[in-house]
């Protein structure tokens, strides 16, 4: 949990620097949207590639390498103005601004490549240490690292008035996290002298796992030609459109409503706190009442998310900030359940030998969402001068996701008795 939350420290800080950069240099939302769109696509591909790698590499060092590079890029982000000035020879004109956008774009791309080293190794660790019948609950607990990281960053950056410090302060905290991972994390039960989890039907043994041909055949069958995995992947795409739209543009949306920077930070933090509670409840309900059929919990929550988003559309201009905050928190509570449990369902279907690959494929699809949440929503906000109909769009997307996940309502995960 702590290790993956560190990745969020040097990832979600970018969103809180955007209003400050916009205010100081006049960089448009569309420019930042393009950066986030391309970066999100790169992250999706990286998550997919690292998912395959994580099934065959040491998870601890995989995490350490990725986090180290992300910390370095976050530090360099704070010097973007000086780097641009070095190449353009100016500190204020159009060339300088364009140079800053290019510098931040390049650094963001590098950051996103190595952000992909975070989720897949953690998923590999979970399926290596946790039996399938406990996976929804335990994975939901681990998934709170998303919200913990984003919550702490939101609070810290909410009180920072210089955009450079939005990058440097979280980077220093994540730097300490690197040493925590090295000292405390181990790859598999076998690496510390404990017995491995029992194998399940259809799973590769250790020798087959090392055989490239056998592993490739298993991967194609369990992941790439599995229609259920693709249903889960497309549903996760819709989940991430909603989640990322609020995380990426939340500070800008709330600033546009007239909220102070401090209150904006706390409002986004409340979304994350509610998400934490939602993940824990969803995992417990899935294992306790639905016999680990997580997709059923996802369907109910997605439908309720759609209702919340339509409500946010009507509240944003109603001068009712408390009601807006309550509904935003409820949306966070609900959307983080599917965000955690769709991966659990995919991992159980693919078995622990290909779980990271399955989750990597879902990750690739989910980060296609940045085409809409990044450039698409940013350009719409610039054109229409507000975020009103974006909430309606997100509500419609959540409704489509509900219909899609209902198609696998009766699914029984492949390795659950």
Language-model regions, residue ranges each:
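Residue-level signature of mid-helix packing/kink "hotspots" within the transmembrane helices
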Residues: 12, 40-48, 150-151, 272-280, ...
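Extracytoplasmic gate region of multi-pass secondary transporters
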Residues: 14-18, 226-280, 339, 373-374
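Cytoplasmic membrane-interface "Motif A"-like loop-to-helix N-cap segments
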Residues: 56-67, 288-302
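C-terminal ends and interior cores of transmembrane alpha-helices
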Residues: 68-96, 303-317
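Hydrophobic core of transmembrane alpha-helices in multi-pass small-molecule transporters
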Residues: 73, 87-117, 321-337
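Cytoplasmic helix-loop-helix junction between adjacent transmembrane helices
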Residues: 104-146
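Helix-loop-helix hairpin linking two adjacent transmembrane segments in secondary transporters
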Residues: 142-190
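C-terminal transmembrane helical hairpin of 12-TM major facilitator-type secondary transporters
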Residues: 292-342
């Amino acid at each position: 949990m702590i290790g993956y939350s560190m990745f969020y420290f040097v990832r979600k800080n970018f969103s809180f620097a955007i209003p400050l950069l916009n205010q100081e240099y006049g960089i448009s939302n569309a420019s930042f949207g393009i950066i986030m769109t391309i970066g999100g696509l790169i992250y999706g591909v990286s998550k997919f590639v690292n998912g395959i790698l994580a099934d065959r590499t040491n998870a601890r060092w995989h995490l350490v390498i990725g986090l180290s590079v992300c910390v370095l890029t976050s530090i360099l982000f704070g010097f973007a103005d000086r780097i641009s000035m070095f190449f353009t020879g100016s500190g204020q004109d159009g060339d300088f601004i364009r140079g800053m956008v290019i510098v931040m774009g390049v650094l963001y791309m590098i950051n996103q490549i190595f952000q992909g080293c975070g989720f897949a190794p953690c998923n590999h660790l979970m399926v290596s240490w946790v039996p399938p019948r406990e996976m929804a609950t335990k994975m939901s607990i681990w998934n709170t690292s998303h919200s913990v990281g984003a919550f702490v960053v939101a609070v810290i950056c909410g009180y920072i008035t210089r955009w450079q410090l939005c990058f440097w302060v979280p980077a220093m905290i994540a730097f300490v996290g690197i040493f925590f991972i090295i000292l405390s994390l181990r790859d598999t039960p076998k690496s510390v002298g404990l017995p491995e989890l029992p194998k399940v039907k259809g799973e590769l043994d250790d020798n087959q796992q090392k055989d490239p041909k056998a592993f490739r055949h298993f991967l194609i069958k369990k992941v790439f030609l599995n229609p259920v995995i693709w249903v889960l992947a497309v549903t996760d795409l819709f989940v991430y459109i909603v989640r990322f739209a609020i995380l990426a543009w939340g500070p800008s949306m709330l600033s546009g409503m007239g909220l102070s920077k401090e209150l904006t930070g706390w409002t986004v933090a409340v979304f994350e706190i509610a998400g934490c509670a939602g993940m824990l409840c969803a995992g417990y309900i899935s294992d306790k009442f639905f016999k680990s059929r997580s997709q059923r919990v996802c369907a109910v929550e997605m439908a309720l998310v759609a209702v919340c988003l339509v409500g946010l559309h009507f509240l944003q201009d109603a001068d009712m900030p408390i009601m807006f905050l309550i509904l935003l928190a409820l949306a966070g509570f609900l959307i983080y359940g599917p965000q955690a449990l769709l991966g659990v369902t995919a991992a159980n279907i693919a078995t622990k030998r290909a779980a990271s690959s399955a989750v990597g494929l879902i990750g690739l699809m989910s980060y296609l969402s940045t085409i809409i949440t990044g450039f698409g929503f940013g350009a719409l906000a610039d054109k229409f001068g507000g975020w009103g109909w974006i909430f309606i769009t997100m509500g419609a997307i959540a409704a489509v996701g509900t219909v899609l996940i209902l198609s696998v309502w009766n699914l029984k995960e492949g390795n659950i008795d």
